[in-house]
Amino acid sequence: LNAAKEAGLEGYVVREAYRSISDQQTLWDAEYNRLKGRHSAWTDDELIAATKKSINLPGTSEYNSGLAFTLYLYENGNDELNKMVFSESEQGKWMYENSWKYGLVFRFPLQDFPTKGTISRAYKTGVNVEMNLFRFVGIPNATVMHHLDMCLEEYIEYLMAHPHIAVFEDGQLKYEIVRQQVGDDSSTFSVSISRKTSNYTMSLDNMGGLITIYEY
């Protein structure tokens, strides 16, 4: 947001960020019961499927990760700004174009949303509603996802098929991204660090893999 401010753009407000499992359960139960009251003949499976169209199951929401948030615009006394649709504003356009430079990705691309020409990834993400949601994945991951035009699900699949990615800048190695399969049921495992760098991070991908990022 400091970079956006330097570009003359302000008014960003975080609408939602971390949401606890219990809060997610409350939202889920409320929507499930609302639908149940309107459709008494529906089976439990039908109610669950309908509820999932607008509310994630507890534990599967992006908000539960603590890494995601939504943005909107507000500035005290600025009615013109406050009425703007984020995706149509200059603030929104700047964020969509530049967020990857700071380790953020737009999480749920749809056809022509957030910007005209965007290709829907709903068939991968499972989300088919307009959500102005960003997720922090780190600059190395966001850089690759941006240049390959991938959503998070596509990126994980790409890493499963190509478990070693090298990113160069001006001819110099900048990042190495390595995925190792450790298994879904592994509570402990060992990893060999063979790169000549002390600056690395590790994270699990919820697909049985460990992603290690080396920065040079």
Task: Kindly label every feature range from the protein language model.
Residues 1-169, 176-216:
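Cell-envelope/glycan interface and biosynthesis
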